[in-house]
Amino acid sequence: MLNTLLVVGFGGFIGAILRMLSINLVNKFFPYSISFGTLFVNVLGSFIIGLLFSYAQNKGLSPLLKSFISTGFLGAFTTFSTFSYQNLLLLQSGNYLHFALNIILNVFLCLFAAWLGFLIFK
């Protein structure tokens, strides 16, 4: 159990740092009211989790590595709370078009990315 806690914590440490760097970098190039940085990490994380579980189903993966990547790294790299807060701000500002677009893009692109990732090792 201690090993699992340590690998999840280490994965979270790496994921949180990469999330911050990725969001800042993407938003620097796409400075719009929709946070494309958040969209980027959520889509990429969805793709990676699709890859991970497809690979694990077909080829096997150690429980520690699976915990490191899924719960640790991806748990910290992707962010639903930030997505929710950004949508709240869009609603409060009356920017309903960007509010709807942000939700649609995040939900459908993340689902599509997870499906694509899963197909790779199927």
Curated annotation (Swiss-Prot):
Na(+) binds at G75, T78. It comes from the Bacteria. Keywords: Cell inner membrane, Cell membrane, Ion channel, Ion transport, Membrane, Metal-binding, Sodium, Transmembrane, Transmembrane helix, Transport. Belongs to the fluoride channel Fluc/FEX (TC 1.A.43) family. It is found in: Cell inner membrane. One of its GO terms (molecular function) is metal ion binding. It comes from Campylobacter jejuni subsp. jejuni serotype O:2 (strain ATCC 700819 / NCTC 11168). Disulfide bonds: none annotated. Fluoride-specific ion channel. Important for reducing fluoride concentration in the cell, thus reducing its toxicity. The chain crosses the membrane at residues 6-26, 33-53, 60-80, 101-121. It is a multi-pass membrane protein. One of its GO terms (biological process) is cellular detoxification of fluoride. This is Fluoride-specific ion channel FluC. The lineage of its organism: Bacteria, Pseudomonadati, Campylobacterota, Epsilonproteobacteria, Campylobacterales. It catalyses: fluoride(in) = fluoride(out). GO terms for cellular component: plasma membrane. Na(+) is not transported, but it plays an essential structural role and its presence is essential for fluoride channel function. The keyword DNA-binding does not apply.
